[in-house]
Amino acid sequence: MESCRGEKIVKPELRKPLVLAAALIAGSLQGPGTTQAQQAPIPTNAAEVPGPAPGTAMTKAYVQMVGRMAYLWGWPLINVANRAAAFSKVPEPGLLGGVVPVAFNRIAMLTDYISPGEHFVTCPNQDVVYGFAYADLDREPLVFQVPDFGARFWVYALYDARTDEFSKIGKQYGTKPGFYLMVGPNWNGETPAGITAILRSFTSVVTMGARVFMDDTAEDHKAIQPLLSQIGFYPLSQFDGKMKITDWSKLPHFPAPVSKDKGETKWVNPETFFDQLPTVMQSVPPLPGEEALYKWIDSVLDAANKNPEIKKTLTETAIASEHELIDPFFQWRNNGRPAGNGWNSPVNNAAWGTDYLNRTGTAKSNMYDNKPEETKYIYTDDDAQNKQLNGKNLYSITFPKGQTPPVKGFWSLTLYNEFHLFNPNSLNRYSLGTKNKTLKYNSDGSLTLYAGAKSPGRDKEDNWLPAPNGTFSLYIRAYWADQAILDGTWKPPLVAQMQRAQP
């Protein structure tokens, strides 16, 4: 039947079945118990994103892959945890092995350059007087004192458990003398009167390093002592608003950890790495964006607790990763960026964030750098011909006139042996630079320094860094560097071989 407009007309007796059929079809499309399409919840934060499903089967290759990444990521954290544990055992501030300042929840200061027998950390320097300590801020916040250093360069570096520096305390920041409070991530107490500022760490475990410049004269060694005696870190409960004075020359001595290695004390054991990692991860919260990484690693650690074969694979992976991933970082060419003329330099030291490559590389080769605006580090193992430096040769390092490292603080060139430690020598000399008052400049105003096992000649010995008879490396420090160093405009000099190897 059609209407006058040509439309088809459905007879009344047929309408009801058609409507019923349409409803049934619509219902079948929507599904049981629903009336419209539903949107799955969209995660609004990392905690709402599902992680690996518990109990899922894991292949050996998968466990190796996760274990390898976890080893690279976690190596600096385990390193810090083991150093802090060693320091926590000392009853009071003192000297570890009679050499290294050691303290927990306080600080210990040296009164002179660090001894060449130091093996606690690689790449020490003899341009500053060191203070060092670890602390657990969950126990109690710490107060630290800043004396009036006058024109002298100084810097306090405060690091979290990842070796990221969370402080800006020093000469280059214009820090005022006074009392400062260092607190952990969960502290919500009241700030007592007399505190100049508060610094908050992202983690409860922190490392504290004080560096105060001293030149190599007897006069400056005497002049610095009253300043050193005013440096102090101590629990908030001991704060009374008065500057505490300490005679650091009377520190007790404690035995150093026993080590069979000739190099740095071994702070990471691959065979126990994955036994320690769960505890460390619980004490070091994930950075924003790291939540998925934590879940990924946790899932394999949980599986290893239930399956001996997975645990065995993780241990094997750690041992292999120590050799394949970590050991190569000890070569300077594998650290940072090329800085010119065969040298390398990091650009984000002590501000690593999620840069696991450079953080772990530095933790292996020269742990506890300062931030670039505090210190610029430039290093090499090779000469101008890309050949490994060797003390059997004599090398010259010439800075053209006006081209010594441009700094507002000071600069130095340090020589290290194959272990990135000092090479004991009869001159008791390990670095040359601003601190040295007897450097001899060339007639054209340039400065040539020498490195090698044998003297370059009596007339050049003031400019000579004695080297071992084997491999060694060179290391430039530029404290409070000018922009030309920070942006790479200034280039370090070539290391030129002057004579062939001795028979």
Each model region followed by its residue ranges:
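Residues at the start of alpha-helices and the adjacent loop-to-helix junctions
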Residues: 15, 29, 59-62
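Bacterial N-terminal signal peptides that target proteins for export
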Residues: 7-19
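C-terminal segment of classical bacterial N-terminal signal peptides
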Residues: 26-34
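A compositional/structural signature for long, glycine/proline-rich flexible linkers
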Residues: 38-503
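Hydrophobic alpha-helical targeting segments used for export or membrane insertion
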Residues: 18-27
